Structure formats: C-alpha cells, structure tokens
Design a protein with these regions (language model features):
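N-terminal Rossmann-like FAD-binding beta1-loop-alpha1 element of flavoenzymes
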Residues: 3-30
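Conserved Rossmann-like nucleotide-cofactor binding loop
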Residues: 13, 36, 215
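Glycine-rich FAD pyrophosphate-binding loop
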Residues: 22-44
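Hydrophobic anchor at the start of a short beta-strand
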Residues: 26-28, 127, 208
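Dinucleotide-binding Rossmann-like beta1-alpha1 core, especially the glycine-rich loop
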Residues: 47-134
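Helix-loop-beta segment of a Rossmann-like dinucleotide-binding subdomain
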Residues: 91-104, 116-117, 123, 128-132, ...
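Helical element adjacent to the flavin cofactor pocket in flavoenzyme catalytic cores
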Residues: 150-207, 211, 215-218
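Glycine-rich beta-alpha-beta "Rossmann" dinucleotide-binding loop(s) and their flanking helix/strand
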Residues: 218-231
Length: 231
C-alpha cells in the first residue's frame, strides 16, 4: 500500500505532523520503533517557551540572536495554538500559561537579559524586565540572591503525558495508520517515492518525514543526509 506520507517517529512532533497532514486530506502512516511518547516527548517538563534561550545567547552573542530571532514569532504563534488545542483535539492537555521567569544573579547577567529582551520585543514578544522588588512581589519563592530578570506572560506548560496521545487519537480519527514496534532498518528511493524497511515489513510512501528525535541523525544517514550539530 502506497501512502502519501510516512512519518518516522511517534513522539509529539511526529503525531502532531501526522494529525495536521491527515486533517488536510493527506494519507499518512506513522512508524514508531517503540511505543508512542516513550522517549523525550514523554519525559520532559512540558514547558512552553517563547523566549530566546539564555545560555546560547550568552555563548554565541548578538549574531546568533539575530539569526534565531525569527523563530520567536513562530514560538509565540505556537503558544497561541496551545491555548485552544485541547478543544481542537478533544482532550484536557492541562495547559497553564502563567508566564515564564528568567532570573539574573549578577549585573552582567542582567545586562545580557536586557540585550536579549531587545531582540525578543522586536519580534513582538511581550517581555517585562523585573528588578529585585518586582521579583520579591511576583515570585517570592525565588532566592534573594537574584537581582532581576525577564518575565514573559505568555509562557507556561502542558502535560507531556497527555499531549502526544491526544494528537495520536485525533490523527487516527482522521485516518492515520500508526505502526508501533516498527523500527526503521533502511530507506530506499524508488521511482514512486520511498520504500521504508522496518522490523514489521516494508512501507511505501511518496514522501517521508523524519520526526525521529534523537534517532533523526541515523534516519537521515539512510538517505545520505548528515545532520550536523549546528548552533
């Protein structure tokens, strides 16, 4: 059977990709080598972030931030989607958007946060700069050693144990086939698309999406693609 798209990986990215494709009428098969939501998608804090990551900003500087900044508006749009995602998928994802706080211990830390905030605000992200008094009032549980920080009111979290299964159920309702315990062993190009050899047999599709997370490098190498670790 020839699918339109094979999605390799049954985590959050893979199941969400399958759902949105199928909702648009695309015939999709998901291949998961273990079970859904088993690896990183099901073992994280569920954080929904929009701010530019602080440590890479400090490490790589303004040039890196300018390249990354265009991602901020995309992240902000994704959080807007999360607000209504539970209703769309018919599940309680336990989304709570109560804001995210990045704190500074030193004046140097605070200067970096202020520089970073300029890039974030330029992309339309709401950032409130806090001094020590603001932190004491809004986050009294934070150590008194922290002298300030940046607060983004749109950040929050979702339940990582609920999100992927909800996407998978919605994907199935749209006709997606999900194959568990289907470890990918090789991928071959054909005149019609791709043959994906797995531990459960060969699956064919016109296109392949690599959503394999930590295994993405190995999957890409099957097609001669090197996923370099680029910051």
């Amino acid at each position: 059977m020839m699918a339109d798209v094979i999605v390799i990986g049954g985590g959050l990215a893979g199941c969400a990709t399958a759902y949105y494709l199928a909702a648009d009428g695309v015939d999709v098969t998901v291949l998961e080598r273990f079970d859904l939501n088993m690896l990183a998608s099901g073992s994280n804090a569920g954080s929904l972030h929009a701010q530019i990551p602080h440590d890479p900003f400090v490490r790589y500087g303004e040039g890196w931030a300018k390249n990354y900044a265009s991602t901020v508006s995309l992240l902000a749009k994704s959080i807007t989607m999360w607000r209504g995602l539970g209703d769309e998928l018919g599940a309680d994802l336990e989304v709570k958007l109560r804001g995210g706080l990045l704190v500074a211990r030193t004046a140097e830390d605070m200067r970096a946060i202020e520089r970073k905030a300029r890039h974030e605000r330029a992309q339309g992200l709401e950032i409130q700069l806090f001094d020590r008094a603001d932190i004491a009032r809004e986050a009294p549980y934070v150590s008194e050693d922290m002298i300030g920080g940046a607060f983004c009111p749109d950040e929050g979290k979702a339940n990582p144990f609920a999100a992927t299964p909800a996407f998978a159920r919605a994907a199935r309702r749209c006709g997606v086939r999900i194959e568990r315990q289907a470890a990918v062993l090789g991928i071959a190009r054909t005149s019609r698309g791709y043959d994906v050899a797995t531990s459960k047999g060969v699956f064919s599709a016109r296109r392949v999406v690599n959503a394999a997370g930590s295994d993405a490098g190995r999957i890409a190498a099957m097609l001669g693609v090197d996923l370099a670790d680029v910051q």
